[in-house]
Amino acid sequence: MKNLFIVIVIFIISRPNVLAQEDLFDILEEESPQTKNFVTSTFKGTRILNGHSIENRNKGTLEFVISHRFGRVNLGAEELYGLDQSNIRFAFEYGLTDNLMLGIGRSSFDKEYDGFFKLKLLKQGAEKGSFPFAISLFGSAVYRSIDDFEPGNEPSSSERMSYTTQLLIARKFSPGFSLQVTPSLIHRNSVKIEDDPHNIFAVGIGSRVKLTKRVSINGEYHYTVNPLESIDATNSLAFGIDIETGGHVFQIILSNSITMIEKSFITESTDDFFEGDVHLGFNISRAFQFGKNKKKKLKEVKESNQ
């Protein structure tokens, strides 16, 4: 796929207010409400499309996620336009605290098992002069369990491991538009050929445009700085629709990536979106609340519609 250059947005930073000299208790009284007012629902769910969004599940929330990607649409009628082929991933994700989410999953592609954490570092303030971005740290580990190696050349458990570290930087510019930039580092303990880099750097960008309270359109693109040399790698591109219905978030996706784990769709995609190598897919999630009262749950539902 030919290189795709996306020029991204300059974030708008509001000038902070200057507090006058006052009594210490008066200052604390004025600042206290500001520290509690943060922007919510930058994205509808925990995924933009393929990649993670800035959003976490709140404390005590367990989410079951099913992700599915079919084969290429341009395979034609013989393969039912890709529907005869598929890759599926099941995952459980849990809000350990309001700021820390943990997850585990299993993909049919390469029989990969993955675990991840996502930690909120900074939140975007809702008041004028407050911090203009939301920032989270994401980390994952993947174990490739498929046995597709020649006898006597099987990799060790350590050689089957890959790791991803990402900084998720997002801003909700308005109720209808959000943007996220995602610098990424993917590390492989082993590579196919000597020229393949163990460490791959990439930069992703994702956006959300809200159409109604429950429907939005999303886009996502990841540019790889130093791609693998052993394959004809392409940059991951995806477009999709978010539909939210109560405890469900349903995403319909068109992407040139058949995989759904960061180390795979960022660095191992080989299809060209503009040549018709498009994979139809979907993500569907169901959230379950534990240990939360009805009042707090109602508040979260209202925030999700913002």
Segments (PLM) and residue ranges:
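Surface-exposed extracellular loop regions of Gram-negative outer-membrane beta-barrel proteins
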Residues: 86-88, 203, 208-218
